[in-house]
Amino acid sequence: MVDKSCLCNCNIFLIVLFISLCLLFGIVKCDEFLTESTVEFSNSGSLTEILSSEQYVQKFVCNDNGLIQLRLYMATFSRKNRSHLYVSLKDENYDEIKSWDIDASLLKDNAYHTFALDRRIRDSKDKTYFLCIKSDAETGQGVTVYYNDDENDLGLSLNGEKLDKQLCYQLVYKKTLHNSMGGGLKLQFLMSALLMIALFAVVYFGRDWSIEKKFLTIWTMLGLMYLLTLPLFRAPDEIAHFMRAYEVSQLDLLSELEESSGIGGSMLPLEGVDFFALKSWLSFWGNHKTIVLSENQVFKHFTNTAVYAPVSYLPQAFGMIILRAFTKNIAVISYGGRVMNWFAITILMYFAIKVIPFGKEILAMIALVPMNVHESVTLAPDGLVVALSMLMLALVLHFRYARQDILKPWEVCSLYITAWAIGMLKIVYLPFGLLYCLIPKERFGGIKKKRRHIFAMAFVAVASNLLWLSLCTDFLRIEATDASAQLSYSLHHLGTFMVVMARTFFSDLDIWATRMIGIDLAELNIRTVGFLIFAYLFMLVFRYIENDRHSSDKTDRVVNGICVLILVSIVLLIAASLYLQFTPVYNNTIVGIQGRYFIALLLPLYFAINKPSRLMVDREQNDISMREFGLIVCSNVCACIALFFSCM
């Protein structure tokens, strides 16, 4: 038996470790945000080697406060020079601020060399400074500096004589956090910091809570944290998602096709709206009040989201309708859509983890991957797909293993709605409807009633999707693609298509796996902490295989088989749909597959390789440990830190 005090000390150590990681990462990202360099000058050539009889002086004026470093673009003539370079920085009164004695043999050829000050100059803005360069080199042992001569009177002199040149230098400024943030950003920063503290407090003090309570608390706090750190329209295609959601909020369920361009879109009150002014926090707080709905409606293109059925945007549209009644501010309306989408996903997730009879810990771990929480607070429907797929599987397992009586009419109705909705959200997830084959016939009142309901559900789901596809086929136009030619080629060269798919998987599977967890967020251009993402992935893999050690019975093999069929079907549909619609004809790889498309497949994957009957027996023993919840929270907090400082 492990001593309780030892276990407690270990848990405290882990919490302190995770908090320290978050703080250190926050310091690193904050330092990157506060450090700013001037642009590099293009080099026009290099000076002659700097000899003992020469002194170059570069005059410059700082355009910001906080000068902390200078960088010179230097050359060594591809040799080791036995000399010293003497560099000094002087103020406008020619008083020395700092001097450097550089061993020329240590300089790197054709590279910037950094000269760091002992402390930042707080009031350097608009002040004049002089950079003096001397050497003790004899001929053949000197180094040099590159120069730029694009303009006249550029401040460089040699032994007091002006040259129409300037050195290729960079100035590095270190701003202060206080001066770099306005009131709104400071409030966001403070609230995010408090949420981080609260999250780790829940991990430690809530260790004896039920898994449902822990999940809901951590999910809610993380959702708020992502809302505070991810600016509007920074998720993939979020501007297009906003336009489609706004169109649905106007009760325009089907987009239009612009005759002149053949591109899908709609008439929206967005004349002159600059969405990009809201995509960074500094710009957001300076511009959000002036970006409002226009009086005139203009045609806006969003053909890639015009194909989405209205059900994909029902929560977002509802939030927009409510906020639009009070304001025309686009930022406020957008956040109304974001929050309502997140709220709907939260409800579905909570019901899923509440009703699932076993595997609650796996469901929570999957739901809390940084990419899924990130997508759930945006206007995109990806988080809704994951939540609904989890609810479907949770209901099926509940009806199969926990229920003994016949389903009530409203429960049967919920099965119809979820089977219809999952396909309408994204047609490639239609095979999730196969889960309903796992519900015992006794729950329907007999085999005939079960078959009748299963066929009816399949008909409703498939027919609805085919009808919608027929209505929006014209919107499926991507530049440099030809779906009909691609389909014809694939049917006549099925083996080639399989090779293309295999090549794509071998080439990109590692990228999909790490992006599925959340190594790259926002528009997939902001890197989080890689080793935490790999640790999260390893944690999931370990959880997936640790229970796979018992013999299975026939009922287990049925569940495993259906889940495998769902996985294979959806993967093939994702590959085929993107090959037809987004990939240029005859391309040797499939274009457009994203890691987040596979998040919804993680839960059925777990039940495809584990034994449900054994999981049901061991369900009371399965929980998420403090170290696992600590890793989950640490990964997400670091992701939010990266988003906040990288989106300035």
Features from the language model and the residues they span:
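Interfacial juxtamembrane loops and adjacent helix segments
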Residues: 252-336
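Perimembrane helix-loop-helix junctions
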Residues: 395-406, 430-462
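Membrane-lumen/periplasm interface segments of multi-pass, membrane-embedded glycan/lipid transferases
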Residues: 178-185, 291-300, 465-550
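Transmembrane-helix signature of polytopic, membrane-embedded enzymes
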Residues: 210-213, 328-331, 350-370
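Transmembrane-helix motifs of polytopic, lipid-linked glycan transferases
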Residues: 199-202, 335-358
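Beta-sheet-rich sandwich/jelly-roll-like modules and their strand-loop junctions
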Residues: 7, 17-93, 107-112, 116-128, ...
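Membrane-interface alpha helices of multi-pass inner-membrane proteins
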Residues: 374, 410-427, 432-438
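Short acidic/glycine- and proline-prone juxtamembrane loop motifs at membrane-interface regions
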Residues: 378-385
